Regions:
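Catalytic cores of the polymerase beta-like nucleotidyltransferase superfamily
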Residues: 1-492
């Protein structure tokens, strides 16, 4: 998509471009002057390049986010200078500069302690591996550089004097809240298949829709994603999941997600044949993800968001039909944790995240009641399974179970009320203090040996674990005097 009247640049000089922009300011997509508040360090970087005789623009994510009223994105600059010329200009200005991507014309200048990527105008060669250009060609015109970019909202350039350069109606698409590929979508996705996940990521992060032709190309080009390294897929998928709009991603681009995470594909149209469920497994999963966001006011932890997506991942594999004709999924939480562990490892996500997600998946069907004993057992199981803080995960597990209940058939949603009572009990118990491991009891091994006249050895640990079991069962509180009194009763 190119807007009429936008590519009329008779000169590659800054003066020529400024004249061109003024001539074509009536274009619907070449914006009239806008005033964005550029940080002083970015202004300094532009000044250094321009004083050396080169042209420079701020591009990409900072421009996109600034037009939306957000200024959190890192600054990227594109310039007519070669990387060697950029480096020389910054060094002459006593600004530290590093060769961070010279094959692609990129150096990083550290201006007022802020890193700024500075890249030569370029166009990309063929993408023979569907991941990165086989070669790049450095060019003198910014139009050629903007033409290689992925989406219109990322293909705008800004200069404090020349204003906004918008050749592909990016500002219009921002206002319309739509993700739109630059040029022919199939070409963009064939060049770099990871752009399909980027389209979903931006749509989820910004709560945008996807333009019709771009959306159609997502479906048609989805198989190309299998050529991309798993860790690169993992990086993009993690940002989609952790943006908190997973249901939106499932709706917009499930064919792409199903290539990125093949384990999701069997969930689609899988009839659960259960009175507890009104939806197939994929629709139920999407509804659990949405309910999770609603219950946490959009502040769910990464582990909870992943667990919401993966909690029923093993249901198709564990499906069986009872004599009553109903569907059953015995063992699917435990099997789901195994599947999730392998999946997260393949995507190169952290072991800590994997441990927490797998614990939540494994225990998402754990039967709880509103008693201290049930709560303590749940926390201890979470702490053991996740190798981390079972109390923090207990909040996530209760939220996951609530979301799961709310995504079931209407008659079975009342369990969410019980879980809310469990949450209140959890808050009460946290104030009192909860032991998650035997080592957190208020008696030491030395005190156990003294009370029972034991010598150092395995028997001490056995007694400590027995005390912990009594504590979990609610038969004793974690107070030193109470625990010593239990030890004094004998029968150890």
């Amino acid at each position: 998509m190119t807007c009429e009247g936008c590519i009329l640049f008779p000169s590659a000089t800054a003066e020529g471009m400024a004249m061109s922009i003024q001539k074509n300011s009536s274009s619907p997509c070449l914006s009239r002057p806008v005033n964005l508040q550029i940080p002083t360090y970015a202004l300094r970087a532009l000044e250094v390049l321009e004083d050396a005789g080169f042209e420079a623009w701020i591009v990409g994510g900072w421009v996109r986010d600034a037009l939306r009223g957000s200024f959190a994105h890192d600054i990227d600059i594109t310039t007519s200078a070669t990387w060697q010329q950029s480096k020389a200009a910054f060094e002459a200005a006593d600004i530290p500069v590093h060769e961070t991507g010279i094959a692609y014309g990129t150096v990083t200048a550290v201006v007022e302690k802020h890193p700024i990527e500075v890249t030569t105008y370029r166009c990309d060669g063929e993408y023979l591996d569907g991941r990165r250009p086989d070669s790049v060609q450095f060019v003198s015109r910014i139009e050629e550089d903007l033409a290689r970019r992925d989406f219109t909202i990322n293909a705008m350039a800004y200069h404090p004097k020349r204003g906004l350069l918008d050749l592909y109606c990016g500002q219009e698409d921002l206002s319309a809240r739509v993700i739109h590929a630059v040029g022919e979508p199939k070409v963009r996705f064939t060049e770099d298949a990871l752009r399909m996940l980027r389209a979903l990521r931006f749509a989820c992060r910004l709560s945008f829709s996807i333009e019709e032709k771009t959306h159609q190309a997502l479906t048609e080009c989805a198989p190309l994603l299998s050529q991309v390294a798993s860790e690169r897929i993992g990086s993009e998928v993690a940002q989609i999941v952790e943006a908190g709009h997973i249901a939106h991603a499932i709706k917009l681009g499930f064919p792409v997600l199903a290539i990125a995470i093949p384990e999701l594909l069997p969930l689609q149209n899988f009839d659960q044949r259960s009175p507890y469920h009104a939806y197939d497994v994929l629709e139920h999963t999407a509804r659990v993800c949405s309910a999770t966001e609603a219950l946490t006011a959009g502040c769910a932890t990464p582990a909870l968001r992943w667990a919401a997506l993966l909690h029923d991942i093993a249901k198709p594999e564990m499906f069986s039909v009872g004599v009553d004709g109903r569907g059953h999924f015995y063992g699917h939480p435990e099997k789901g944790a195994i599947v999730a562990k392998a999946l997260l490892k393949r995507l190169a996500l952290s072991q800590h995240l994997s441990n927490e997600v797998c614990a939540l998946v494994a225990l998402h069907d754990y039967d709880v009641d509103v008693t201290t004993a049930s709560l303590r057992h749940m926390i201890a199981l979470l702490a053991e399974a996740s190798k981390s803080d079972g109390i923090a995960l207990a909040y996530d597990l209760l939220t996951l179970k609530q979301a799961d209940a709310l995504a079931k058939a209407n008659p079975y949603r009342s369990y969410a009320v019980t879980l809310e009572a469990m949450r209140a009990l959890l808050l009460h118990e946290v104030k009192r203090g909860i032991a998650q491991h035997p080592q957190e009891l208020c008696v030491s091994g030395a005190e156990i040996m003294e009370a029972l006249s034991l010598q150092p050895g395995p028997a001490v640990g056995v007694c400590q674990r027995r005390l912990f079991e009594l504590y979990l069962a609610g038969q004793v509180e974690n107070r030193r005097e109470d625990l010593l009194a239990i030890l004094a009763q004998g029968n150890w």
